[in-house]
Structure formats: structure tokens, C-alpha cells
Regions:
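Intrinsic disorder at enzyme termini
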Residues: 1-13
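N-terminal glycine-rich anion-binding loops that anchor highly charged ligand groups
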Residues: 15-24, 50-52
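Generic alpha-helical structural signal
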Residues: 10-17, 44, 111
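Glycine-rich flavin
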Residues: 26-125
Length: 125
């Protein structure tokens, strides 16, 4: 079994790592590195950072604003987030509610809810 990554995968990994090293919000990085609990605003800032980088919809189809990444790219992305000591991504909107809406929702529901879930303007509590 070959479990090595392709050159494209390694380049993708480096792009993510570089983006995190250069652009990850410093106030969140400092708290994470010191083990200080993040506030709600910190978590929102982190998610908005992901959105601005084009990474918030890491597991969403392109047609709904996602990245369209492969499973290998998603794996590498999540590994790089962990390596950079990023906070966990809040799962409810992006990983639970959003996919149900884009899979089973009608067009009105998709238009109304998906953009705000992706931008973290609306989320499940």
C-alpha cells in the first residue's frame, strides 16, 4: 500500500501551512499557545479568518461556496490546523446543519441559510 502524498498534495499542505503562519490572527494564536480559553468573539474571529482565506467550506461542494477539496486535501488541511494549534472548528453549522440543507433543503432554504452559515453570521447553538 502506498500512503505517500503526491507532489500536488505536498504543495497544497505547504500553502495551508504558509497561510496559517502568515495570517492566523495573533490574538487567537497567543491564547491558544498559552492555554487560555477562547471567547465567543475569538471563535467567531477564527471562523471569519477561515472564510476570508476561502477555507471555511473545506468539506462543502463548490456550488454552495465550498472548496471542493479532495478527501486527502481535507485531511491535510485539518492536520495543518492541528499542527498550528488552531482552535477546533465549531461543527454544528458547517458540518451538521449546512450539509443537511445543501443535500435535502429546497432552493429557498439553500439561498437563505447557506451563505450565512459559511460566513458564520448564523450558527446553531
Amino acid at each position: 500500500m502506498d500512503i505517500s502524498f503526491s507532489e500536488q498534495d505536498l504543495q497544497f499542505k505547504e500553502e495551508i501551512r504558509s497561510g496559517l503562519e502568515n495570517d492566523f490572527p495573533s490574538h487567537i494564536r497567543e491564547k491558544q499557545n498559552q492555554g487560555i480559553a477562547l471567547t465567543k468573539d475569538d471563535r467567531i474571529d477564527f471562523h471569519k479568518f477561515l472564510y476570508e482565506k476561502g477555507w471555511a467550506g473545506y468539506n462543502w461542494p463548490v456550488k454552495y461556496g465550498g472548496t471542493g477539496w479532495s478527501l486527502v486535501q481535507i485531511y491535510l488541511f485539518l492536520n495543518e490546523l492541528a499542527y498550528a494549534n488552531c482552535p477546533t472548528i465549531l461543527p454544528f453549522g458547517l458540518n451538521m446543519v449546512g450539509p443537511v440543507i445543501y443535500t435535502y433543503g429546497n432552493q429557498h432554504q439553500k439561498d437563505k441559510f447557506l451563505p450565512d452559515i459559511l460566513k458564520f453570521n448564523s450558527w446553531c447553538k
